[in-house]
């Protein structure tokens, strides 16, 4: 098996982001974005995705957290895409149904090469601590488009905003872990087109 890891940097006038990902890791993480709740969610994603993740970000959080959260999504998506290489032998599809107390979240994804997000995640509160919850959608969209994954995130039940978001990040990690896993029975690209 090839060493499925990647390092990506993104520097703009608004943010300076470094992401390193190792798809065949064991859930180790080192995350510092300057956005506390977001850091917590990225750590959960790495742990439940069993991927090793480093994220270092500096951004214009004195304005708000939008640029940092979105740009981390962009850079993480590019890192995962690069780490996957030509996608030979991967399972390709992944899904997870994750309970978090009263909330129940479904994530399904396809490493299709076609970035797309379908989000049905009504969040009761506009903020969790200092975190603007509308940024969850911005992160998922940036990740999906830059990774080239079709991503569906759906809340089946839930009342507590923290629980709903946490369930979504855990489910994303578990679904991605499944999708990027190697299937020993497959020798090529998991598509009749021969390319993803």
From Swiss-Prot:
Top-level class of the enzyme under EC nomenclature: lyase
InterPro entries: IGPD_sf (IPR038494), ImidazoleglycerolP_deHydtase (IPR000807), ImidazoleglycerP_deHydtase_CS (IPR020565), Ribosomal_Su5_D2-typ_SF (IPR020568)
Primary localization class, coarse: cytoplasm
GO molecular function: imidazoleglycerol-phosphate dehydratase activity
GO cellular component: cytoplasm
Keywords for this protein: Amino-acid biosynthesis, Cytoplasm, Histidine biosynthesis, Lyase
Protein name: Imidazoleglycerol-phosphate dehydratase
Name of the coding gene: hisB
């Amino acid at each position: 098996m090839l060493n499925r890891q990647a390092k990506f940097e993104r520097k703009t006038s608004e943010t300076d982001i470094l992401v390193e990902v190792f798809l065949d890791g064991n859930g180790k993480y080192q995350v510092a974005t300057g956005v506390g709740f977001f850091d917590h969610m990225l750590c959960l994603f790495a742990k439940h995705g069993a991927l090793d993740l480093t994220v270092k970000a500096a951004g214009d959080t004195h304005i708000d957290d939008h640029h940092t959260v979105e740009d981390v999504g962009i850079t993480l998506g590019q890192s995962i895409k690069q780490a996957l290489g030509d996608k030979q032998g991967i399972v390709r599809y992944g899904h997870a149904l994750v309970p978090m107390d009263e909330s129940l979240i479904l994530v399904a994804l396809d490493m299709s090469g076609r970035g797309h997000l379908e989000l049905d995640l009504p969040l009761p509160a506009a903020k969790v601590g200092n975190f603007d919850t509308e940024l969850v959608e911005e992160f998922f969209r940036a990740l999906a488009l830059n990774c080239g994954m079709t991503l569906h995130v759906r809340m089946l039940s839930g009342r507590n905003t923290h629980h709903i978001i946490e369930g979504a990040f855990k489910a994303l990690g578990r679904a991605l872990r499944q999708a990027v896993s190697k299937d020993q029975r497959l020798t090529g690209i998991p598509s009749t087109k021969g390319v993803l």
